[in-house]
């Protein structure tokens, strides 16, 4: 959080940083369905990321997940899980990452933008062990 705190201060962003496990924070009334946007990197399959992130997003907000080249197929495969969690089908945007000095070309990523159109059912997010064992 130190880096994020410094970055937000330097950019003069009016944000609140919260350090919590997503599966716990997503059940807290003070955090549940309170945020306009939640983001995630490609650290898990989309149904898992959606279960962690969509409970934080209020209706009318968005969940944005960064994925690799297979992002479009992953979005299609996860549509049922996303809908169960209150999300609309993902809109897929292709972006190019800046070229680092040690690379010759920019890398492509997919931003999966999921609009929150309904409340996430109270059963979600489930405990992390159950999410890992039985993804939606």
Q: What is each residue range found by the language model?
A:
Residues 76-136:
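SAM/dcSAM-binding transferase cores
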Residues 4, 67, 114:
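Residue-level signal for inorganic ion chemistry
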Residues 14-16, 62, 88-91:
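Conserved beta-strand segments of alpha/beta enzyme cores
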Residues 42-43, 118:
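Short glycine-/small-residue-rich Rossmann-like dinucleotide-binding loops
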Residues 1-42, 48-53:
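Conserved SAM/SAH cofactor-binding pocket of Class I
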Residues 57-59:
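Helix-to-beta-strand junctions that scaffold the AdoMet/dcAdoMet cofactor pocket
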Residues 22, 43, 66-70:
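Short strand-turn motif at the edge of the Rossmann-like AdoMet-binding core
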Residues 1-2, 71, 75:
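Short alpha-helix immediately C-terminal to the canonical SAM-binding loop
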């Amino acid at each position: 959080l130190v880096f994020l705190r410094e970055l937000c201060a330097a950019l003069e962003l009016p944000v609140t940083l919260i350090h919590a496990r997503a599966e716990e924070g997503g059940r807290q009334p003070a955090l549940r369905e309170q945020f306009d946007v939640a983001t995630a990197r490609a650290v898990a399959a989309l149904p898992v990321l959606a279960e962690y992130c969509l409970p934080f997003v209020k209706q009318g907000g968005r969940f944005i997940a960064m994925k690799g080249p297979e992002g479009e197929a992953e979005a299609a495969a996860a549509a049922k899980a996303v809908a169960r969690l209150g999300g609309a089908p993902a809109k897929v945007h292709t972006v190019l990452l800046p070229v680092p000095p040690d690379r010759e070309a920019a890398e492509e990523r997919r931003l999966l933008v999921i609009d929150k159109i309904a409340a996430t059912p109270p059963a979600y997010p489930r405990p992390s062990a159950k999410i890992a064992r039985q993804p939606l």
